[in-house]
């Protein structure tokens, strides 16, 4: 029986130079390490990331309280437990914290421990993490959402919407799909240079030029796909995917420009336009008729259930509508959405909920109710590649892990290449079959 002998946490730095938590879990015969990501645009319903708040140390962002919680309370409680009992470990962590949002010990402390335990258990079992979690049928590589153009909270420019992404859906292998993404990324860089626009990148490695409008952003991405020699689909109400190799995905992160008091969506970075929920839903309906969009994440604000319902009724049958801030990887909020027939997909961020068990429960609930799952990074990342392993373990079929630059993003793409190699002939890339619209 692989009993936990020590749980050790330390403060490290993430891809934005901010402190985060890294945890080592040791047993008598195995070891696991996990580092915790952090978001820039965070939902109000997310589990709480515990930071010290001392403005004189790392501008208040130090995580030494969370580190100490791991090294004392959590270490004392988990010592002697069987590291392969993931559910028991996670339930113990939840009970030890004693709050609904993990604000006592910190979700960053709890998550680091939860993931490190899974890795130690996988090593003890002599298996890759994706095999340990997912079993012998874990053979599906995810279709990536590649964030090539940034705006919103992820970039200092005049684009309201946070992420403009490409999805290489017309391929039969992950490695070919990845190559497509890389070539489109470089074609976009050349296109921006030719137009005299900045090729500086945002938090997730996508370009962040100052553009005249939100429309110009998506049109540049579509143009870059063609310049790279790939075909882009049609709008989903006019033929849609067909034999296209690439479709477009968006993450507007609408909660960031939603005025909850006035119930208005305010395009404050670009035109200053103000739209109510009905007008915002119509806006997205028009975009999905004008552009080859297959997926929109957080198209409406996190608590604008009325707006979400309007949009779901309008385009939910032909466009993947992903709830991130809406569902926050939380089974209770997802169950509400399912009951209200809102959205048709959930974004899975391990640090939104705080344990591996709860993450897997959210994916399972989505799957049982016909919702897709997209495994996701955060804007503040590390070299940790756990989400790549989770994507394959769960057969989610989709992953969102940034652009084709910055080593913190490339680490996940490269890990998927290694998994594809390990799987060999068993590796399956679903392409368009990853979607249910």
Swiss-Prot record:
UniProt EC number: 4.2.1.11
Residues bound to (2R)-2-phosphoglycerate: 162, 349, 378-379, 400
Matches recorded under SUPFAM superfamilies: Enolase C-terminal domain-like, Enolase N-terminal domain-like
Listed SMART domains: Enolase_C, Enolase_N
Pathway: Carbohydrate degradation; glycolysis; pyruvate from D-glyceraldehyde 3-phosphate: step 4/5
Compartment list: Cytoplasm; Secreted; Cell surface
Cofactor note: Binds a second Mg(2+) ion via substrate during catalysis.
Domain of life of the native organism: Bacteria
Catalytic activity: (2R)-2-phosphoglycerate = phosphoenolpyruvate + H2O
Enzyme class at the top of the EC tree: lyase
Main location: cytoplasm
Binding, Mg(2+): 251, 297, 324
Family recorded in the similarity comment: Belongs to the enolase family.
Role, per record: Catalyzes the reversible conversion of 2-phosphoglycerate (2-PG) into phosphoenolpyruvate (PEP). It is essential for the degradation of carbohydrates via glycolysis.
Protein name: Enolase
Biological source species: Chlorobium phaeobacteroides (strain BS1)
Lineage: Bacteria, Pseudomonadati, Chlorobiota, Chlorobiia, Chlorobiales
């Amino acid at each position: 029986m692989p009993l936990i002998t020590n749980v050790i946490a330390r403060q490290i730095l993430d891809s934005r130079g901010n402190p985060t938590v890294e945890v080592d879990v040791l047993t008598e015969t195995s070891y696991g390490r996990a580092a915790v990501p952090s978001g820039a645009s965070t939902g109000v319903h997310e589990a709480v990331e515990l930071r010290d708040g001392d403005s004189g140390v790392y501008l208040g962002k130090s995580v030494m309280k969370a580190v100490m919680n791991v090294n004392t309370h959590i270490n004392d409680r988990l010592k002697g437990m069987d590291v392969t009992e993931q559910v028991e470990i996670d339930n113990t962590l939840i009970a030890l914290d004693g709050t609904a949002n993990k604000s006592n010990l910190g979700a960053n402390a709890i998550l680091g421990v939860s993931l490190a335990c899974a890795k130690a258990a996988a090593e003890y079992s002599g298996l890759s993490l994706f095999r340990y979690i997912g079993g012998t049928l874990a053979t599906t590589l995810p279709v990536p959402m590649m964030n090539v153009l940034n705006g919103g909270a992820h970039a200092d420019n005049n684009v309201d919407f946070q992420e403009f992404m490409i999805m290489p859906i017309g391929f039969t292998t992950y490695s070919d799909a990845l190559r497509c993404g890389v070539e489109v990324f470089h074609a976009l860089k050349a296109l921006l240079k030719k137009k005299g626009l900045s090729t500086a990148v945002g938090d997730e490695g996508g370009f962040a030029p100052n553009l005249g409008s939100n429309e110009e952003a998506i049109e540049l991405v579509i143009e870059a796909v063609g310049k790279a020699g790939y075909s882009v689909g049609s709008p989903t109400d006019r033929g849609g995917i067909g034999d296209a190799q690439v479709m477009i995905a968006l993450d507007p992160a609408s909660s960031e420009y939603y005025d909850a008091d006035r119930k208005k969506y305010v395009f404050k970075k670009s035109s200053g336009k103000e739209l109510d929920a009905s007008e915002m839903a119509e806006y997205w309906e028009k975009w999905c008729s004008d552009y080859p969009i297959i997926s929109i994440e957080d198209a409406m604000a996190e608590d604008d259930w009325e707006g979400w319902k309007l949009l779901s009724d309008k385009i939910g049958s032909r466009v993947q509508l992903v709830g991130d801030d809406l569902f926050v990887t939380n089974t209770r909020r997802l169950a509400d959405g399912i009951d209200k027939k809102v959205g048709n997909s959930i974004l899975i961020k391990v640090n939104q909920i705080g344990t591996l068990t709860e993450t897997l429960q959210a994916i399972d609930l989505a799957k049982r109710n016909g919702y897709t799952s997209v495994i996701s990074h955060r804007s503040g990342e590390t070299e940790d590649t756990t989400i790549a392993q989770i994507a394959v373990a769960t057969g989610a079929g989709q992953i969102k892990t940034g652009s084709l630059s910055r080593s913190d993003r490339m680490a996940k793409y490269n890990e998927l290449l290694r998994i594809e190699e390990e799987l060999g002939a068993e590796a399956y890339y679903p392409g368009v079959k990853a979607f249910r619209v």
